[in-house]
Structures are given as structure tokens and as C-alpha cells.
């Protein structure tokens, strides 16, 4: 038991997003919500059982958004990048950290719980992009891929929905992924910088404690007129 969470050994191969259905996604969002509320209200980490698909190793991010006027603003986003924990425990860890440890924000308060919606992103395996920089943009599709940039000691990750929400094309996506890693925006043009793409599945509450839906990022990108591929 660590911090009130039973850390079970993850069993089986890492889970891929396409293996999860909407019932799994809703369960993960509800668990993330409970983990946030348990931490904010009682200072305890949620104790969860890791079994079945959700007990396999998984990588996940939890995003918190607070209602602001007619829209939503980011309130916290942290994740477990590598599948080192059972998926359900990765979600609990990410949820607590998003509510308490995102360095961009103060810890979430009790008064905010009714105004915050929860989103869970399950990451797939990392696929390295070619070393030849000119080949990279054509292999990135906005609405399908997220990006992870690494040049030790620097590293940074952008979830696929970020590019959709911001309306970026693949080159802008690569540029901002480099910046996220603390590197120059042109770092994707360097062969010594490792860049990975990954797929993901995203579920979120439509409103605080409300229905849970899967985000269709490709459809969202098309509706916004995003240039999803390099022409």
C-alpha cells in the first residue's frame, strides 16, 4: 500500500486504446472523478482494485477543465507517460496529481469541484518517427496522433486533442511539441531529437459529474477546418 493506494503488479501486455470500449472509458472517468474528490475533500488517495483490462499496464492522462463563462478553461493536466502501472492506478495517480501538483496551478479547492469536468486520455504505444526530419510531418495526422519529444534531459508530450483544440496543422503540432519539451520550436528538424507519435482514446464528462462521452477527435478537427495532414 502506497499513499492509501494498493499498488498491484500490472499483468499482461500494455493496453492499447482500441481495446477499450465506452463502458471502460466511462468507468475510468468515474474513477478519476472519485480520486479527485477523495483527495480534495479528505486528503486521501482512492483505493482501487486493478483487475481485467483495466488492470493491465497502461499510460494515461487526466485533464481537469473549469467552467468559465460559456466555455471551459484548463485547470490541471498530468499523466503517466509509460505503462508502468495498472491502467486504473495510472488514472488514479494522474487524477490526484492533476488536482494537486500541476505546477501551473494552485491545488484544486473543494469549492471548485462542482465546476470542474474530468477527461481521461488512454495512450497507446509510442512509435518513433524517422530520423530524417523532412519525412516527419507527413507521418503526423492531427486528430489521430499525439506527440512525444525527447532529447535527454529534455522531454515533452502533447495529447492529440491539444492540436485539435488549438487548430494546429502537423508542422505547428511538431513545433509546439518541441517547445513543450523545453527545446527550440525547430527541434523536430534535428536528427538527434527523438520524436514519437502515439494514438489515444479520450473520454470526458459533458459537465461536472454528468454523462461521459468519447471524443471523436478526427470529426472535431474536420468540423473546425483543421489541416490534419501535410498537403
Swiss-Prot record:
Domain of life: Archaea
InterPro entries linked to this entry: AMMECR1, AMMECR1_dom_sf, AMMECR1_domain, AMMECR1_N, AmmeMemoSam_A, Uncharacterised_MJ0810
Domain named AMMECR1: residues: 29-214
PANTHER family: AMME SYNDROME CANDIDATE GENE 1 PROTEIN, AMMECR1 HOMOLOG
Protein name (Swiss-Prot/TrEMBL): Protein APE_1056.1
Higher taxonomy: Archaea, Thermoproteota, Thermoprotei, Desulfurococcales, Desulfurococcaceae
